[in-house]
Amino acid sequence: MLVGLARAGATEPSRQPGGETLTIDGKGITLTFPEDGPTLRIGGKLQLDYGAASLRQAGLPEPFPENIAVRRSWIESYLSYGKVLEVAFQYDFAEPRRPINDAAVAYTGFANTLITLGNMKEPFSLDQLISDNATLFTERSLADAFAPARNFGLALGHHGTDWTVAASVFGGNANTGLTREGVAATARVTTAPIRTDEAVLHLGLAGSLRDLPRDAAPLSLSSRSEAFLFRQTFVDTGDIRDATTIARLGLEAAYRTGPFLVQAEYIRTRVERSGAGPLSFQGGYIQASLVLNGQGRAYKLAPDYGATYAVFAGIVVPEAARVTRGGLGVFELATRFSALDLDDGSLRGGIERDVTVGLNWYPDRNIRFVADYVRSHASPSALAGGRTVDADTFIGRFQLYW
């Protein structure tokens, strides 16, 4: 149905017997009730990954158990009531262990302020807070291993004309138990000293401190080398059974001018242990992209709910560029260097560095094809018992979202 919509465009809003208006377009299915009543929108996404990888060292396991897999298969629903209430629920049919993503309710009655309760992303890391629909590559950087991502909690956010602040308290994830992972306090502040239609300069600082319960599952940190299809991780701390707290500090910077965008982050993580000294890990990335025949990514200061403030949105395909209108679509080139250091003292989780180059093609609205090449170097690698691992990976994605 949605591919057909991409070809034909949005349907005309239809008036229902009770006065409701039903619209089907690139944003999904929207039902609007009259007289300042609620608005219900149903959308979703499908991400299909395919690829191949080779390891340069002999004697290591096959990198991909299969060469094609569904990365995400979401259905999403959003309910707005006047200017005071936002409700969101997202369910991923491709993730049996953690199918619930956002499940939150937000009060929006105060000016420029959001109060949100539910399962949502903690306000940490620009890369993590950008929507899965709009990430530059198929996967986020190696440093995303440190991002707390989604948990259940309470977040308070506020923004001005060029700045944002979000503070929050979180427990565990709604899928695995709200009390199993302790309690975290997470906050993020951003400023955009340059913010015009042509250029944006973004600066951000985030911090998170999580107290871990003694009966919690052991803490571990790892990364799948920027490709979902990998069977095993190249770097992995394994179980840190005596961890008592985990603290994270993140620095962000990004600059967009016209179709060019450069973005970087550095994250440092410290794990306190009972009966042993603390462990320190670090990671970061720098990435750049250039839209070859279209507009650059827009800067979105405030979300509809939650704490995903000050992020870059996806690519907009102009009407004349749509393949269904005789155009060629929009093309975007991208490159990234990322690094992750999980070595400290006697804990040898490994050090990995990746270089990625990619091409994104947006043939029409709500459709994207991604082609990435990733060159990975891990030395030492937890996968190879402390030896070096080098990998060459091609990963592609077909993405449909509405």
Briefly describe each language-model feature range:
Residues M1-L2, G19-T21, G28:
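Generic N-terminal initiation segments characterized by hydrophobic and/or small/turn-forming residues
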Residues M1-R15:
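Cleavable N-terminal export/targeting peptides
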Residues L5-A6, G51, V271:
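Hydrophobic alpha-helical elements and their junctions with loops/disorder across both membrane
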